[in-house]
Amino acid sequence: MPIDLVRASVEEAAILTNLFQYYVYDLSDVVDTALGADGRFVLPSFEAYWSDPWRHPYLVRVDGTVAGFVLVHQRSRLTGDDKTWDIAEFFVMRKYRRHGVGTAVATRVFNSFRGKWEIRELKANAAAIAFWRSVIATYTKGDFTETLLDDERWRGPVQSFQN
């Protein structure tokens, strides 16, 4: 099963927008979200991903089929440090979960951007917490720290490591 991680072009912005609907739906179990009058989730604008040099949008494909996305920031959401890498959003379609796709994609992202990393999960998202703890522990061979935040910056665990 070939897994590709490719930087999304501006022409592929609609694919990202469409996938984000599924992502927000998945998160609706743990985040209070509501549908707009048109029956879709209200989404942020993704235009900045093609104009801000510190934002990096990626599409995930499995066997050539769109299977998810990763939005990477070169800026800490917690401190604003522009030397820290941050996975802003990470999504793999359910069909491809528990088949190594997420782990392979996360590893490729980490290997593509060297330096300090922060990975955040929402406190109520037990599946994401378990996934990221496992991926990061394997990737770093256990050399990472985890902090549990519960303030205006974030509510949930944050793993930090250097690669």
State each model region's role.
Residues I3-N18, L27:
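A short beta-loop-alpha structural element at the N-terminal edge
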Residues V24-E47:
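Conserved GNAT-fold acetyl-CoA-binding loop/helix
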Residues S45-L59:
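A short helix-loop-beta-strand connector motif used in the catalytic cores of GNAT acetyltransferases and
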Residues L59, T65-Q74, D86, F91:
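Conserved beta-strand in the GNAT
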Residues R75-I87, R97, G115:
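A conserved beta-turn-beta hairpin within the catalytic core of GNAT-like acetyltransferases
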Residues I87-R98, E121-K123:
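A short, internal acetyl-CoA/4′-phosphopantetheine-binding micro-motif in the GNAT/acyltransferase core
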Residues V92, R98-N111:
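Conserved acetyl-CoA-binding loop-helix of GNAT-fold acetyltransferases
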Residues E118-R133, A137, T147-W154:
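Conserved beta-strand-loop-alpha-helix junction that forms the acyl-donor binding cleft
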